[in-house]
Structure formats: structure tokens, C-alpha cells
Amino acid sequence: MAQLMIDIAGTELTAEDKKLLAAPAVNGLILFTRNFASLEQLQELIREARAAAAKPLLIAVDHEGGRVQRFREGFSAIPSMGSLQKIENEDERQRAARDLGWLMAAEVQAVGIDISFAPVLDVDDCSDVIGDRAFSAVPSEISKLASSFIEGMHEAGMACTGKHFPGHGSVQADSHIAIPEDDRTLEQIRAHDLKPFLSLIQKLDGIMPAHVIYPQIDPQPAGFSEFWLQQILRSELQFNGTIFSDDLSMQGATVAGDMEQRAVAALKAGCDMILVCNDRAGAVQVLDADLPATEPESAQRVNRMLMSSNAVSLEELKRTQRWEQAQRWL
């Protein structure tokens, strides 16, 4: 059975939300700023969503830090990963990356959310939509800092997701509103953008491919490409973690057809879980479609992204020495 991650419009579940969450193919929910009014409300929403779901629900958020942090009030203001470059001492930079990875993950899990889609492994090249979301413009520096950040996430008990494979940072167009194309050869991408993914592949629990077309390599965006997902990611890199599609409602995904065609293409290419956000009609269309079944291993991979144990409350977390230690980097 296909695995689908959906979104909801408000701070409470509607009857339609509950019906969709109960659909057998839905086992993921992504939350946005619009779903947050207070810590208490957010935790109640999460409890209700889990109760409504037909099977274990993977709840996710984009909580990278900087300009991409969906929840603010009650949460630490995580700085952008690019701002770590302001720390001149390398050991201190690595310590900051690890502490911030832990802090982000621990706070997000404390309210009942399984994962934040992080870290960004893109190179800070010419993309405004990436920019300071990236650790650096230098692949080797990204690899070092992201490795420490992931260690912090894992210390907190959160699975990590590297994005946007094989690299979104070297195209100017924003795949939310355009269809970016990167005209470089495979050799050029291997020598630059792909390096952080190559070096961190053993640490990554999940990967999210880019809605970017690399026409010298494949006419399909990476998230719909068997070459990128099967030949490179699964076969060559031996990646055995979860592959999440990026949001299928983004403009960069429209080349694959209507929402049903996008879902089919992403699943056939090798995505374990597909995301349909900000398009309720599209989500319903996907649920009503005859989608290709995913292999049993695919469900196991998604289930490995769930929290392994109950996290402490946010209030308890803020009383720990580890939390105090991480605050120095804010």
C-alpha cells in the first residue's frame, strides 16, 4: 500500500481531517505555522491526530532554524545553519552544530512530533531559497557541520532527513514556484553538490530529493527519477533509509502531470512516502487513485522514523543542564 503524508488547515481537526487521517494509505502528517496557536493546543492537536489515524502516524515539521522554523513561541530560536560560519574556531563550530541539532530535535520531540525534515545538505551557491539554510558554500565544510548536527539529533533520539538530493543549491529558480533546471553533468554534480550526501550516507535515516531537473542526466526531476533514486541512491550509495518525496503540490513537481500522475511517478521512481500539502483536493485525488503498492520494506523504513520512546515534556527539558548548555549558541 502507498504511504501518504498530508497536512491540515487549522489548529483543530475537522471532521474531514479525521476521515482522511483514518484512510489506510495515510500514515504521515506534516505541520505548519498555521497549525500552531500555543504549546497546549499543539500537543492536543497531535494527540487527536494520532487517535484519528488508522495506523502509527509519522508527524513531521520543517524546523531547520533561521527562516525555516514553523513554531516560535515556547521554542528556542534556532539560528540558521549558515550563521555557524561566524564562529571562527572550528572545534567550537562543530560543538555548536551538535548542540543545535540536539536542541532542535529535543524540543520538537518534547511536544510529540517525530521528526523535523533536517538537515539541509545543499551547497550555498546561487539559490535564494536555499541561501543560509545551507551550512556552507564548501561541500567539505557542509559534511563536517552536518555530521555534528546529525549526531546531536541522534543523541536526542530523532531520525534525520538529508535534503534536497542530489543538490538544490546550484540553481537560481525556487522549486516551490518554478521548475528549476541544472545543466551540469553528472561528473560536475558528483564533484560538488553530491559530496555531502556521499560522505554522510551512513548517518542519514531519510533523504528528500529535489524537485530539480538535471537534463544532462535525466529528463525527470530527481524525485521522479529512477536513475537518481534507484541507480544512484539505492544501488550505488547503498542507501537503505526512507526516501520522502518533496511536496507534490510544488510547481517543480508539475512536470509529472496531475496529482495522481505525480504520486504514481514518485512511488514508481522509489519514494517510500509521498507528501501532498496545501492541496486538499489533490490529497483526496491521490487517496482515491489506484496507486502502485510499496514493498513491505518500505513500510518498515517509514516506521523506523517514528520516535522510539516517549520524550520528556518541554518544561522538564528546559530544566536540564543539556538544554542550558545548548542555549549559549542562540
Curated annotation (Swiss-Prot):
Protein name as catalogued: Beta-hexosaminidase
Family designation: Belongs to the glycosyl hydrolase 3 family. NagZ subfamily.
Binding site for substrate: D62, R70, R133, K163, H164
GO process terms (BP): carbohydrate metabolic process; cell division; cell wall organization; peptidoglycan biosynthetic process; peptidoglycan turnover; regulation of cell shape
Annotated organism of origin: Idiomarina loihiensis (strain ATCC BAA-735 / DSM 15497 / L2-TR)
Keywords carried by this UniProt record: Cell cycle, Cell division, Cell shape, Cell wall biogenesis/degradation, Cytoplasm, Glycosidase, Hydrolase, Peptidoglycan synthesis
InterPro entries: Beta_hexosaminidase_bac, Glyco_hydro_3_AS, Glyco_hydro_3_N, Glyco_hydro_3_N_sf, Glycoside_hydrolase_SF, NagZ_Beta-hexosaminidase
Single GO term (MF): beta-N-acetylhexosaminidase activity
Entry-linked PROSITE patterns: GLYCOSYL_HYDROL_F3 (PS00775)
